[in-house]
Amino acid sequence: MDPVEEVLNNPATRAYIHRLIGDEGINLLERFPKDGEHSDEDLAASTGINLNSVRHTLYTLYEKRLAEYHRIKNNETGWLTYLWQLRIDLLYDAIREDMETVLSKLERRARFEEENDFYICKDCHDIYTFTVAMGGNFTCPNCGQPLSHFENETLAKALRARIEIMKKTLGHA
């Protein structure tokens, strides 16, 4: 089976790709010629997809290292032509990199939740750290109502559970 077809037939990897490049990008991948390198103009012409959409998709894939190009300069005009090829074989590396980024953000958020006390306005539902609440004499800066202690243990536990699942998935001990 073709690597692109294999990726697009898997619901999880298809969803990841779709989040990156949308419907038109998926359409381009489905129609991308199997072999060789192709200019963005040739891809637009052969697939019937708008040139700007083709370029946007290719640049987005390039940012994740899922497409690569090399340039050829026309010596007469000085114009550059970019010849593209897909690197779908690097998809799992891109997913792993994104998961590592999310894991790092979740860990920072969990630390923030665990290291702070929070107060909530029962009317506005805005939440403030202890420092901010104390600075406003435990009254809501928006509506003047008194702030109540907000128990964030459920959120902190949920973050820690998600972090553990991601660590196991990524092979972290």
Curated annotation (Swiss-Prot):
InterPro entries with a match to the protein in the record: TF_E_archaea, TFE, TFIIE/TFIIEa_HTH, TFIIE_asu, TFIIEa/SarR/Rpc3_HTH_dom, WH-like_DNA-bd_sf, WH_DNA-bd_sf
Question: PROSITE patterns this protein is in?
Answer: HTH_TFE_IIE
* Residues covered by the HTH TFE/IIEalpha-type domain: 9-92
Matching entries from Pfam families are given as: TFIIE_alpha (PF02002)
> Could you name the domain of life of the organism this protein comes from?
Archaea
**One example GO MF annotation:** DNA binding
GO annotation terms (biological process): regulation of DNA-templated transcription; transcription initiation at RNA polymerase II promoter
Keyword list, A-Z: DNA-binding, Transcription, Transcription regulation
What the entry lists under SUPFAM superfamilies is as follows:
Rubredoxin-like, Winged helix' DNA-binding domain
Q: Which PANTHER family match?
A: GENERAL TRANSCRIPTION FACTOR IIE SUBUNIT 1, TRANSCRIPTION INITIATION FACTOR IIE, ALPHA SUBUNIT
What is this protein for, i.e. what is its function?
A: Transcription factor that plays a role in the activation of archaeal genes transcribed by RNA polymerase. Facilitates transcription initiation by enhancing TATA-box recognition by TATA-box-binding protein (Tbp), and transcription factor B (Tfb) and RNA polymerase recruitment. Not absolutely required for transcription in vitro, but particularly important in cases where Tbp or Tfb function is not optimal. It dynamically alters the nucleic acid-binding properties of RNA polymerases by stabilizing the initiation complex and destabilizing elongation complexes.
Similarity comment: family membership = Belongs to the TFE family.
Entry comment, domain topic:
The winged helix domain is involved in binding to DNA in the preinitiation complex.
Assembly and interactions?
Monomer. Interaction with RNA polymerase subunits RpoF and RpoE is necessary for Tfe stimulatory transcription activity. Able to interact with Tbp and RNA polymerase in the absence of DNA promoter. Interacts both with the preinitiation and elongation complexes.
UniProt protein name = Transcription factor E
Q: What is the lineage of its organism?
A: Archaea, Methanobacteriati, Methanobacteriota, Stenosarchaea group, Methanomicrobia
- Chain's gene name: tfe
